[in-house]
Amino acid sequence: MLKATAGGGGKGMRAVWKSNELEKAWNSSRQEATASFGNDGMYMEKLIEEPRHIEIQVVGDSSGKACHLSERDCSIQRRHQKLTEETPSPFMTSTLRNKMGEAAVKATEFIKYEGAGTIEFLVDKNKNFYFMEMNTRIQVEHPVTEQVIDFDLICEQIKVAAGEKISGKNYFPKLHSIECRINAEDPFNDFRPSPGMISTMHFPGGHGVRLDTHVYSGYVIPPHYDSMVAKLITTAQTREGAIHKMLSLIHI
């Protein structure tokens, strides 16, 4: 797998299946990386077939202590961009969760990281996991973690920045939560971004329903940024319950 060093959102990524395809794919990825990020740096890594994209939420403090807040499964993607996220992962076992959590905490403490962060892994069908990257910020999908462990990540990040210490306790899901990204796109035109004015906006609600957004009726979606305009999150006692709520809200 070829990847851009400054990449994100699937830009500058190419899978190479044959050695004679490497040079062409490298040049193509490099050009895309330069156009997208102004940086032509590239690297290669092992290609994992049929991977699961599973990330571990971590928090570290100024004393060098870190904890994890379990995983998020971000495997449902389009063009290497996340569409839905959930926790706990239906692919996970308790053993794998503990192993990945321990690895994430060890890495976080080794670099003396402070604040909330996410360590992302690819997991193969045999449940071997491979480090991809660390996102040193709050993730778009952080609400599902907050919902299942009753933990305010934003508040915790502010406390850590103020010098407070974390408890050091690792957290595990008590509920099931799913997030769907709401994008301003045209499904009849290859899902291209569709900027413009929102004439009417109706917000869903109810028990176990959360909507994070900045838009409103009359808001004009600009053409310059990512097409995501909202995040719809449902939480229930079971995965089936969270899915049922989500389907009822988006009218599928």
Stretches found by the model and what they are:
Residues K3:
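Non-catalytic, regulatory and substrate/membrane-recognition segments associated with hydrolase enzymes
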Residues G9, V16-I250:
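ATP-dependent carboxylate activation and anion-phosphoryl transfer catalytic cores
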